[in-house]
Amino acid sequence: VIQALARLSTDAVHGHDHADAYGSHIPPIYLSVIYEYTDYEQGLAVFTDRGKMLRYGREENPTTRALERVVTKLENSEDALAFNSGMAAISTVLLWYLKPGSKIVIPMEVYSTTLHILTVLAPRLGIRVEKVWPSAEAIAEAVDSETAMVFLEVMTNPTNKVIDLSYLAKHIDLEKVTLVADNTFTTPVLLKPIKYGAKLVVHSATKYLGGHNDVVGGVVAGRKSIMDELWEWRRMLGGILQPFEAYLVMRGVKTLEVRFEKQSTSAKAVAEFLAEHPRVEDVMYPGLSKSPYHDVAKKLFEKPLFGGVLSFRIRGSYEDTLRFMKKLKVIKRCPSLGGTESMAVLPVKAGAMFIEPEHRVKLGITENLVRLAIGLEDVNDIVEDLAQALS
């Protein structure tokens, strides 16, 4: 079991624990796909700290393993695995755990590709999927003796509802039901779901962990016994994160806390500006005191921050919203988040496509809804760009 060294930023910088033969304090990028046997007759090779032999790049890689050690410490878990995308990580978890007859409870508002893969898998594997309102109360009520897994996002995408993990820990037997928490929006800076009984934590490392919009990756952190099983599934499915991508994510993680704090601080300032603007109908951000999720966010989050993503409704039609989007200059029209650049997207066109139409209406994902992911620009430039686009 890997233990956290110290506070989060120190772990982010030093948590790889790589001892280099040449004294390099930066873990090298090991591009080799194959590794020599130390004892060919016995079929033995060099072992990693996980207890797995280095034989073939689809199984293990020293650079990728260094990133996994960092993530393990950031999430205060026992082990972690890195995948070649967030969806590869999520898909592997679902394929590993869900069997014919399994029931999974999932909020109707999660990343739409997660919903889509469950829609595809359910009839083929005989899985029962129960979609519920994204609240701890609705989730707990849906869990019964046949429930195998609860999958949720701590902060939902795109309307920023915050699910009270402490409520779930009190009202669900999380030894019998596997809780999988997607911590992409909140990151370990704000929250460590394992503290509340989650057996697994997943991230799209493409977002805040990588942080620069130049690498696609995913991670899963959790109990070592589960990680050992998932390692076999990753080996079979071929989803390991490649070494150069692992290096980029590891480099991004070093500045995670610094970046996330600035993005969160800027996001709150932007949310406050938008909340007072006459062209804005409403703002969805738990950092606003009037948000219905403000109190639960303050209770759960480990810092007085509320994340770098907010959503808001333009006062007007879909055409008015499109005009606003076209006028943006500093803020880029891109369907991602967590990077250095601020990005705006219309969830009905990107990100929420696979959420059922009637659920979109109920959740408030309307044609005039804009999701705004704050980057590292000066917050005054972001506000000025929004002001001119709204004028």
What are these regions (language model features)?
Residues 249-258, 308-315, 371-375:
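Short, well-ordered beta-strand elements within core beta-sheets of diverse protein domains
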Residues 268-341, 355-361:
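Conserved small-domain helix->loop->beta segment predominantly found in fold-type I
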Residues 2-3, 9-21, 79-279, 284, ...:
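Conserved PLP-enzyme active-site core in the AAT-like
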Residues 119-120, 128-130, 259, 326, ...:
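PLP-dependent enzyme catalytic core of the Aspartate aminotransferase-like
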Residues 51, 215, 305-309, 367-371:
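Short, solvent-exposed beta-strand edge segments and adjacent coil->beta transition regions
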